[in-house]
């Protein structure tokens, strides 16, 4: 593509503009160059580790293929494999077992068995009916009090209910019923492993949790379970440590890339969050084969974060010119008399996307063009929000959602997440994702509104709740309840889109759903991205501390 050099007119009266310039005070990075210490020597996976890993995998594969005919035993084994973060090794075997269970469906009176089967089948795309839970209702249509003492069954029903779609009122009832009784029964649960599983589920249910982070928390809980399978536990620990070394090496390389940019020096108003962003993207795909995809997506989300902070810091005149430069993707633009940070902003962006182009094969270069267009769309939306702020304009709820679901960056990330996935995706997948299908819109709604719910009270930017309050004349509590309802409905949209017949492959859909899962963790109770102290322990668990074998 031919690029023409251009000169952009200078912005005048910079001193007076500085007086109205907005700025935010973000907590400095808590990691600095810590991960630079992880080099090829201390992240090397030894031959002994490879050999033991292969041996343990074969043993677990035999467990799956030679599992007894009892469907409940098979399902519990599959559930443990998934929660230990090992599913990616046994996808074929798991799919064959679930096909058989689905084809040979038998009614069951055991709540745990019914709920576990429902959850596993729905997780794998089977559109099984929720009326399997009717047997546990009384004549009034409420759940029977007799099941409240079945803690394992109650937990299984609670977990299964989060796979619900629109119109499945019995699952909405199940969440309310189970959460109340599990919470009130916690002191009575003597089984330590079960008690901890209940606590974790009440905080974030399995369906909404991250595979990698969830596995790190589940492994010690599984170890405390007297019925655990030793070979499965051993593989889970070894696999976790091996993948951790891969992530440490990637994070070391990315830290080196980030350090060379000198962001804190050149853009001191911005968030320095490379490590937290890597945690974010590992939530999208943690598996070893996605190293390139992770590197690309971390770089893209890092640029989005810098641009977001710049659009909240710069003046409207500066942003108008910056938006124009990015809209034209003018890599040779020369902007006279601009503050240095504005020029660094688009230089970082263009250089980073040039690096991304180098990451993919020539036959896949079209993918980067899709990614660029989504970034341009994101920048236009940032500019729309900036105009609202400078004009003191409070948008309607509809106007707000149209723009803010873009500035949440999940439309851009959904597209860019596919760029480095190799042969697992096609051009048709990119054509599909940029049309903003329902699952992408739903993930974007979750991203924006979860952020809004924990946003600072004194933020200058309008929030969904504020727009709803002013437009409909309701209280803050009522507006927040409406926002939560939209988040709940968005999860149901995503659940529906993952059932057969699917609009895209599960490899593609999983990236979009995982983005929703990341935001659910980061914005449950607080903004753990804006406040890195809160997520520091999570980072240590996943990237620093190996498991004891």
UniProtKB/Swiss-Prot annotation:
GO terms for molecular function: germacrene-D synthase activity; magnesium ion binding. The keyword Metal-binding applies. GO terms for biological process: diterpenoid biosynthetic process; sesquiterpene biosynthetic process. CDD domains: Terpene_cyclase_plant_C1. It comes from the Eukaryota. Its cofactor is Mg(2+). Binds 3 Mg(2+) ions per subunit. Pathway: Secondary metabolite biosynthesis; terpenoid biosynthesis. It catalyses: (2E,6E)-farnesyl diphosphate = (-)-germacrene D + diphosphate; (2E,6E)-farnesyl diphosphate = bicyclogermacrene + diphosphate. The keyword Magnesium applies. This is Germacrene D synthase. Mg(2+) 3 binds at residues 451, 459. Belongs to the terpene synthase family. Its EC number is 4.2.3.75, 4.2.3.100. It holds the Pfam family Terpene_synth. InterPro entries: Isoprenoid_synthase_dom_sf, Terpene_cyclase-like_1_C, Terpene_cyclase_plant_C1, Terpene_synth_N, Terpene_synth_N_sf, Terpene_synthase-like, Terpene_synthase_metal-bd, Terpenoid_cyclase/PrenylTrfase. Mg(2+) 1 binds at residues 308, 312. The Asp-Asp-Xaa-Xaa-Asp/Glu (DDXXD/E) motif is important for the catalytic activity, presumably through binding to Mg(2+). Sesquiterpene synthase that catalyzes the formation of sesquiterpenes and sesquiterpenoid alcohols. Converts farnesyl diphosphate (FPP) to germacrene D. Converts FPP to bicyclogermacrene. Germacrene D is the major product. (2E,6E)-farnesyl diphosphate binds at residues 271, 308, 312, 448, 451. Mg(2+) 2 binds at residues 308, 312. A motif (DDXXD motif) lies at residues 308-312. Keywords: Lyase, Magnesium, Metal-binding.
């Amino acid at each position: 593509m031919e690029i023409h050099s251009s000169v952009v007119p200078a912005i005048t009266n910079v001193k007076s503009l500085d007086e109205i310039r907005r700025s935010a005070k973000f907590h400095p990075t808590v990691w600095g160059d810590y991960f630079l210490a992880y080099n090829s020597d201390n992240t090397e996976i030894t031959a002994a580790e490879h050999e033991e890993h292969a041996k343990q995998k074969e043993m677990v594969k035999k467990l799956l293929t030679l599992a007894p005919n009892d469907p409940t035993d098979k399902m519990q084994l599959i559930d443990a494999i998934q929660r230990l973060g090992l599913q990616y090794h046994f996808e074929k075997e798991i799919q064959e077992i679930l096909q058989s269970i689905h084809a040979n469906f038998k009614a069951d009176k055991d709540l745990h068995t019914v709920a576990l089967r429902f959850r596993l089948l729905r997780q794998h795309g089977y559109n099984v009916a929720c009326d399997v839970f009717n047997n546990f209702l009384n004549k009034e249509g409420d759940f029977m009090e007799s099941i409240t003492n079945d803690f394992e069954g109650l937990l299984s029903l609670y977990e299964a209910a989060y796979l619900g779609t629109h119109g499945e009122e019995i699952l909405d009832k199940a969440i309310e019923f189970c959460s109340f009784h599990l919470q009130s029964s916690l002191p009575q649960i003597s089984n330590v492993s079960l008690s901890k599983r209940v606590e974790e589920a009440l905080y974030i249910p399995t369906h909404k949790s991250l595979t990698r982070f969830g596995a790190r928390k589940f492994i010690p809980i599984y170890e405390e379970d007297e019925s655990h399978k030793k070979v499965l536990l051993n593989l889970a620990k070894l696999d976790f440590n091996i993948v951790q070394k891969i992530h440490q090496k990637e994070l070391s390389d990315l830290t080196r890339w980030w350090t060379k940019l000198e962001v804190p020096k050149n853009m001191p108003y911005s968030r320095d969050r490379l490590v937290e962003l890597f945690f974010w993207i590992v939530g999208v795909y943690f598996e070893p084969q996605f190293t390139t995809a992770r590197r690309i997506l971390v770089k893209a989300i890092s640029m989005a974060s810098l641009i977001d902070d710049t659009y909240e810091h710069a003046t409207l005149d500066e942003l108008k010119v910056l938006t124009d430069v990015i809209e034209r993707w003018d890599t040779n633009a020369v902007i006279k008399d601009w503050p240095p940070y504005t020029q660094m902003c688009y230089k970082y962006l263009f250089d980073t996307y040039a690096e991304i182009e180098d990451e993919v094969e020539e036959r896949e270069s079209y993918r980067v063009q899709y990614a660029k267009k989504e970034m341009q769309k994101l920048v236009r939306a940032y500019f729309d929000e900036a105009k609202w702020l400078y004009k003191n304009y409070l948008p309607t709820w509809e106007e707000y959602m149209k723009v803010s679901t873009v500035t949440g960056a999940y439309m851009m990330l959904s597209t860019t997440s596919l760029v480095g996935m190799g042969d697992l995706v096609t051009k048709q997948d990119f054509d599909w994702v940029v049309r903003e299908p329902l699952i992408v819109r739903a993930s974007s709604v979750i991203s924006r509104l979860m952020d809004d719910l924990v946003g600072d009270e004194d933020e200058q930017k309008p929030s969904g709740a504020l727009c709803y309050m002013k437009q409909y004349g309701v209280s803050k509590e009522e507006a927040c309840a409406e926002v939560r309802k939209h988040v709940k409905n968005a999860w149901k949209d995503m659940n529906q889109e993952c059932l057969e017949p699917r609009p895209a492959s599960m490899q593609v859909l999983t990236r979009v759903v995982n983005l929703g899962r990341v935001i659910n963790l980061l914005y449950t109770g607080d903004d753990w991205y804006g406040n890195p102290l809160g997520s520091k322990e999570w980072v240590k668990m996943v990237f620093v501390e190996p498991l004891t074998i």
